[in-house]
């Protein structure tokens, strides 16, 4: 059972997924900080001091903090756009590498050339037999 677990846990896909999750979480924190600490204050300056996080309505001690919800949606949109751009650049780079691999078709070996000639001769013989 332990060996099966080791095979599963240390497969390339599982390790890649784990690394992706950790990097994604860190990336999410960076983008959230960018939105919270830089973009939102800049928007506040442009729009006349608007702070989304303080927007709320309520009755008595109860409050609905819809400003936090707006801020979270804004964070999500920025994170989604950032990840989209990252994936787009990554796909473009990997597709270039694949195109280079496809272009690098090795020249046929001497044996392959001889086999091609033999094939062509056999085709000629078969076509001449069909005519006769």
UniProtKB/Swiss-Prot annotation:
Protein name listed in UniProt: Large-conductance mechanosensitive channel
Oligomer status and interactors: Homopentamer.
UniProt xrefs under Gene3D superfamilies: Large-conductance mechanosensitive channel, MscL, domain 1
Transmembrane segments: 14-34, 38-58, 67-87
GO cellular component: membrane; plasma membrane
InterPro entries: Mechanosensitive_channel_CS, MS_channel, MSC/AndL, MscL_channel
Organism for this UniProt entry: Bacillus cereus (strain ATCC 14579 / DSM 31 / CCUG 7414 / JCM 2152 / NBRC 15305 / NCIMB 9373 / NCTC 2599 / NRRL B-3711)
Subcellular location: Cell membrane
Keywords noted in UniProt: Cell membrane, Ion channel, Ion transport, Membrane, Transmembrane, Transmembrane helix, Transport
SUPFAM superfamilies with a match to the protein in the record: Gated mechanosensitive channel
